[in-house]
């Protein structure tokens, strides 16, 4: 409830202040705060609904044959434009095609979350999107040279409302949703991180 009340209180509070403020510059500043918290609240509600549907089994996984190398290229094209000026996005993948039965849209949702976190937490350096074939698994990973995750937080990052760090705004539900999705796909997520050095999030999909 705290996660919902915080942006809601900001919206109500600054709306009341804005109603009695005559200075146009101050009004604009308050409006930006209201919009920011409104977007956060909307994202939070959407994430809660998505997580609830996935965990209850009401959100179906649509399995089909998916070519993962091409999917990686598609994800890369979408995110190249989102890179900060001091950050390079690199792709490392084999030349050959890898087909497997999975839910294409859900895999992309997980990778979008990994990359979104990497972009938020990396001010300069390199973000790497990669694909490796490891036996019965396809490993898709996102590595960054960002701020990293404190060691005491690593065991809790998939807990609901747990944020990767205290510097970046978010709902704290993205990784919980990713974990639920990947488990439904028959896969797993592995994370390694070092504070001040960066993080790697790896999605393992069964290779059939």
What are these model-derived regions, one by one?
Residues 62-67, 84-98:
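Conserved catalytic submotifs in the C-terminal HATPase_c
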Residues 174, 178:
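Short alpha-helical Gxxx[C/S/T] motif in the catalytic ATP-binding
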Residues 36-41:
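Short alpha-helical segment of the dimerization/phosphotransfer core of two-component systems
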Residues 19-25:
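Short acidic helix/loop segment immediately C-terminal to the autophosphorylated histidine
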Residues 52-63:
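Helix-loop junction within the histidine kinase core
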Residues 13, 149-161:
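Short conserved segment of the HATPase_c
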């Amino acid at each position: 409830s705290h996660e919902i009340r915080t942006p809601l209180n900001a919206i109500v509070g600054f709306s009341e202040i804005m109603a009695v403020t005559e200075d146009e510059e101050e009004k604009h500043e308050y409006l930006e705060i209201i919009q920011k918290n409104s977007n956060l609240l909307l994202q939070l509600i959407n994430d809660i609904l998505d997580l609830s549907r996935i965990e209850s089994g009401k959100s179906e996984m649509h399995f089909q044959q998916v070519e993962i190398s091409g999917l990686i290229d598609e994800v890369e094209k979408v995110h190249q434009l989102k890179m900060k000026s001091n950050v390079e996005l690199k792709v490392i993948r084999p030349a050959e095609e890898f087909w497997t039965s999975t839910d294409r849209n859900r895999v992309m949702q997980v990778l979008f979350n990994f990359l979104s976190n990497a972009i938020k937490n990396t001010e300069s350096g390199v973000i790497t999107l990669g694909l490796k074939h490891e036996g019965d698994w396809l490993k898709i990973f996102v590595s960054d040279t960002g701020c990293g995750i404190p060691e005491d937080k690593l065991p809790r990052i998939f807990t609901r409302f747990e944020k990767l760090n205290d510097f970046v705004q978010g709902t704290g539900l993205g990784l919980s949703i990713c974990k639920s999705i990947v488990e439904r796909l028959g896969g797993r997520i592995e994370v390694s991180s070092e504070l001040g050095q960066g993080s790697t999030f790896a999605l393992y999909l069964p290779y059939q």
